Amino acid sequence: SEDVLTGCFFGTLRYLPFSRGLNQILKHYAVSEDTQVAHILSGLSDEAFDFEFWKRSENGNVEIDGYIPLASVGIGIEVKYQSGLSGVNQLEKEAVVLKEEWCPEKEKLLLLIADAEEAKQIYRENKNKAVFQDVHLVYLSWQDILLGLDQVVMMSPYEEKMVEDLK
C-alpha cells in the first residue's frame, strides 16, 4: 500500500544525511517549471533531518504523507502509488497548511511523488493555481527515484546496504 511504501522508503532514507541522500535525488530528478526550485535545492546543506509521517493540520482536516522541516525550507510530501488524489484541491489544501501553519517564514516546497505520467498530469493540473505562487510545486516519479538512488553519496558499507535495500 501507499503508506507501507512511504514508511519503508522514507523510514530508511532518513538515516542518511539529507545533503548526501534525499537531496541528491531531488537535485538531479525533481521536476518543476518554477525556476527557483533548483536554486533552493542547490542551497540546502542540512545533514540531520526529521521526517514527520502523516502530519495533520491543526484543525485535522488535512493530512500529508510526509513533512521535512529543514533550516531554511519546509518540504511537504504527497505520495501516490496506483491511486489518484483524494480530491481536485488536495494539493492546494496541503500547500495552504505549509504556508500558514508549518513554515510561514521559510521557503516551501510541495513534492508530489507518483508514477511518471500521473505525476506529470497532476502537476500540470495544479501548477497555475494561486497558492503555488508562494509554495513551490515539484514532482518526482517513482521511476526517477530508482535512478536517483545511484546519485546518493555513500560513505560506509552500512549506507551502501541501505540504498541497495531500497532498490
Predicted ranges, named:
Residues 1-167:
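Charged, terminal alpha-helix-loop-beta segments
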